UniProtKB/Swiss-Prot annotation:
This is Bis(5'-adenosyl)-triphosphatase ENPP4. PANTHER family: BIS(5'-ADENOSYL)-TRIPHOSPHATASE ENPP4 (PTHR10151:SF79), ECTONUCLEOTIDE PYROPHOSPHATASE/PHOSPHODIESTERASE (PTHR10151). Disulfide bonds join 254-287, 394-401. Hydrolyzes extracellular Ap3A into AMP and ADP, and Ap4A into AMP and ATP. Ap3A and Ap4A are diadenosine polyphosphates thought to induce proliferation of vascular smooth muscle cells. Acts as a procoagulant, mediating platelet aggregation at the site of nascent thrombus via release of ADP from Ap3A and activation of ADP receptors. The lineage of its organism: Eukaryota, Metazoa, Chordata, Craniata, Vertebrata. The chain crosses the membrane at residues 408-428. One of its GO terms (cellular component) is plasma membrane. Residues 429-453 are cytoplasmic. It comes from Bos taurus (Bovine). Keywords: Blood coagulation, Cell membrane, Disulfide bond, Glycoprotein, Hemostasis, Hydrolase, Membrane, Metal-binding, Signal, Transmembrane, Transmembrane helix, Zinc. Belongs to the nucleotide pyrophosphatase/phosphodiesterase family.
């Protein structure tokens, strides 16, 4: 019985190794392939990525933050904060207090980034540690007067191989050692916008290229002797959904352009009214049934998208696959930014290294959960954040973890085993102490007349 209970307990929990003290601090490489939708893993072949997953862990779906855009979600990954908390609320922003504008071509002002502390800054505050980055959004900005010790200014023309070469060189030969590094690549986002995620031929081509990049990454780490000691996380910021010219919401047909300033367009449009806010809201409310219109104070709480001066007074959210346009707007065949509860908007996460289990699959975590997990791996004290470390414990070898579905199965199995053993014991006892052979009882009156004379 004691042995059975021990087996049951060990089955409910994943093993705990503990953080052993080591002369060299742990190292972590964070890689993002922009716009890598979670179900691409089921719909396309990824031999190199699947080998990576077999030797590590896979989170099948990561629920990202609203709005599901590139800059906001990349900052949520490295801060563990919702967009309303870290301040990067869109790819295009306007601050009403300072009158400043932000866009993907005008993103170098630390003002926009200083509302949070990204993990590369925290990492460098530790003794004998440095950080490195290959074009991760924000890493070429002096956030809180600090950039990574090694970084590349953003340029989309720089090849993946060059970015990878720089990052792996920094990880293998820097002093003080690089213990945290990031690597960003624009695909499959660019192709998803151009062709749409349902264009199987073109998407297969770009996804095969990404898989080759992952194979190149693994090979490079093995050549440099980093494969067994370096923790690697591969993830993304958002997914992608199909759009078409038949699913268009034309704002110019609903509202006079002189009534408002458009800060961000689609699929989440940010409206700054020039006239009475209620009048603008009322006109937009009846504009199109495929678009939700919210006053800032009425934005659903589940979006965590209210408490920032950079969120405009009126927000428009298109239904999945619908595009908000002006008369002169161009149309993309694929887009993102929609409701983060849509599976098409969610990415995945895969990880390998000494901190992670091997061959383990987990159904889902949140984007904001990645930050506290990374801090744990690096031994850093995290800044206040919206993530939950407990959501990622099952991925890590040094954490106790109750996996509820497995636990239920094990408990049911254990009860069946106990029931079977109990039945067997009862049957065996009955066999050992079976009925005695019949014998005639010697009665008192028989004493004078014994049976055998």
């Amino acid at each position: 019985m004691k042995l059975l209970l021990m087996l049951l307990f060990s089955g409910l929990m994943t093993g705990c190794r503990g953080n052993s003290s080591s002369a060299s601090p742990p190292k972590l490489l964070l890689v993002s392939f922009d716009g890598f939708r979670a179900d691409y893993l089921q719909n396309y072949e990824f031999p190199h990525l699947q080998n990576f997953i077999k030797e590590g862990v896979l989170v099948e779906q990561v629920k990202n933050v609203f709005i599901t855009k590139t800059f906001p979600n990349h900052y949520s990954i490295v801060t563990g904060l919702y967009e309303e908390s870290h301040g990067i609320v869109a790819n295009s922003m306007y601050d009403v207090n300072t009158k400043k504008h932000f866009s993907d071509h005008n993103d170098k002002d630390p003002f926009w980034w200083n509302e949070a502390v990204p993990i590369w800054v925290t990492n460098q505050l530790q003794d004998n540690r440095s950080s490195a980055a290959a074009m991760w959004p924000g890493t070429d900005v002096p956030i809180h007067n600090s950039t990574p010790s090694y970084f590349m200014n953003y340029s989309p023309s720089v090849s993946f191989r060059e970015r990878l070469g720089n990052v792996t060189t920094w990880l293998s030969s820097s002093n003080p050692p690089v213990t945290f590094a990031t690597l960003y690549w624009e695909e499959p986002d660019a192709s998803g916008h151009k062709y749409g995620p349902e264009d199987k031929e073109n998407m297969r081509r770009v996804l095969e290229e990404i898989d080759e990049h992952i194979g190149e990454l693994v090979h490079r780490l093995k050549v440099l002797g980093l494969w067994e000691s370096l923790n690697v996380i591969i993830t993304s910021d958002h997914g992608m959904t199909q759009c078409s010219k038949d699913r268009v919401i034309n704002l110019d047909g609903c509202l006079d352009p002189s009534y408002y300033t458009l800060i961000d367009l689609t699929p989440v449009a940010a409206i700054l009214p020039k006239i009475n806010k209620t009048k603008v809201y009322s006109k937009l409310k009846v504009c199109d049934p495929h678009m939700n219109v919210y006053l800032k104070e009425d934005i659903p709480a589940r979006f965590h998208y209210q408490h920032s001066d950079r969120i405009q007074p009126i927000i428009l959210v298109a239904d999945e696959g619908w595009t908000i346009v002006l008369n002169k707007s161009s149309l993309k065949l694929g887009d993102h930014g929609y409701d983060n509860s849509l599976p098409s908007m969610n990415p995945f996460l895969a990880a390998h290294g000494p901190a992670f289990h091997k061959g383990y699959k987990h159904s889902s975590i949140n984007t904001v959960d990645i930050y506290p997990m990374m801090c744990h791996i690096l031994g850093l004290k995290p800044h206040p954040n919206n993530g939950t470390f407990g959501h990622t414990k099952c991925l890590l070898v040094d954490q106790w973890c109750i996996n509820l579905p497995e636990a239920i199965g094990i408990v049911i199995g254990a009860l069946l085993v106990l029931t079977t053993l109990t039945c067997l014991i009862i049957i065996m006892q009955n066999r050992v102490s079976g009925p005695r052979p019949f014998s005639r009882l010697q009665l008192q009156e028989d004493d004078d007349d014994p049976l055998i004379g």
